[in-house]
A protein has these predicted regions:
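Conserved catalytic/acceptor-binding region of the Class I
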Residues: 28, 147-213, 227-231
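C-terminal helical/coil "lid" or tail adjacent to the Rossmann-like core of SAM-dependent
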Residues: 2-28, 199-253
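Core SAM-dependent methyltransferase catalytic element
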Residues: 195-197, 257-266
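A short SAM/SAH-binding and catalytic strip from SAM-dependent methyltransferases
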Residues: 117-131
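Class I SAM-dependent methyltransferase SAM/SAH-binding core
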Residues: 51-53, 57-109
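A short glycine-rich, Lys/Arg-flanked "PGG" loop and its adjoining helix->strand segment in the class I
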Residues: 132-147
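A short acidic, Gly/Pro-enriched loop at the edge of an enzyme's catalytic core
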Residues: 109-118
Length: 266
């Protein structure tokens, strides 16, 4: 049985939990900062053709559509039909924005070679079967001079201080085992180069929080609503320990998020 986290919801309840998580994280100041940094590196221009690969609820696709304007276009792709339906429900036609086309598709097997000026892929590679193949596929989507932006987390860099470290190590080890590629964030620059792209730029945003409610909105293993991520034997003690550290004001949580941008040679 595949028990990896963040996979497409198999039930209405699972889908609802996933949508709630994505809604919550999209409003978090760290995610907003990461996206602002990525957009600064990309310098999206009016009239460009953009692919959002793994669009989720579509909030970035809508931002990109505003940047490219009516002369540009955005294709928003997601493998999960229910997620794509949710993105469509959230779509609002904005006259000064480019057209958004929503498509069901697998990031690793898209077939629009050379069709885009910009490709955006955020927090997707940690979940795909083969991140290297996925990056090569995304690079093929670019026309000459086109830019690819990949954003992802290095879950091995997740720090939780204020809780017994033996317990923490056990819980975080189990959590990382539920992510297909937990360390992919650190590999982004190398993967862009191996896909034949040039002039890579890498930035890291260190998400730091000293409040449990704030950190739990970004890190699922800290969230009681995701308690199934914690081994049964540790679950009760883990959340009691987090609550106690939080009440004492002794909790520190940190997580590195990487942004990498490179371009296809002209």
């Amino acid at each position: 049985v595949d028990d990896k986290i963040f996979q497409a919801g198999s039930t209405a309840e699972a889908q609802s939990i996933m949508e709630e998580y994505l809604d919550r994280i999209s409003r978090h100041e760290v995610v907003l900062s990461v996206r602002a940094s990525a957009l600064d590196l990309l310098s999206v221009r009016t009239g460009e053709r953009v692919l959002d690969a793994g669009c989720g609820l579509g909030e970035v696709a809508r931002d990109l559509a505003r940047l490219v304007g009516p002369a540009g276009s955005v294709m928003a792709v997601d493998l999960n039909p229910a997620m794509l339906a949710a993105a469509r429900r959230r779509h609002v036609v904005v006259p000064e924005a480019g057209t958004i086309t929503y498509r069901i598709g697998d990031v690793a097997s898209l077939d629009h070679s050379g069709a885009f000026d910009v490709v955006w892929c955020e927090r997707v590679l940690q979940h795909v079967a083969d991140p290297g193949s996925a990056v090569h596929a995304l690079a093929r989507m670019l026309g000459p001079g086109g830019r690819l932006c990949v954003i992802d987390v290095d879950w091995s860099g997740l720090v939780v201080d204020g809780v017994d470290q033996t317990l923490t190590a056990r819980v975080l080890h189990a959590f990382r085992g539920k992510v297909s590629h937990p360390t992919v964030g650190r590999t982004l620059r190398r993967r862009l180069l191996r896909a034949g792209l040039v002039d890579p730029v890498l930035r890291a945003v260190q998400a730091v929080s000293t409040r449990l409610d704030d950190a739990a909105s970004v890190v699922p293993v800290l969230d009681r609503r995701e308690s199934g991520l914690v081994p049964d034997v540790d679950r009760s003690l883990w959340f009691r320990s987090l609550d106690l550290a939080d009440a004492r004001g002794e909790l520190t949580i940190a997580l590195p998020i990487y942004v990498a941008v490179a371009r296809r040679p002209r």
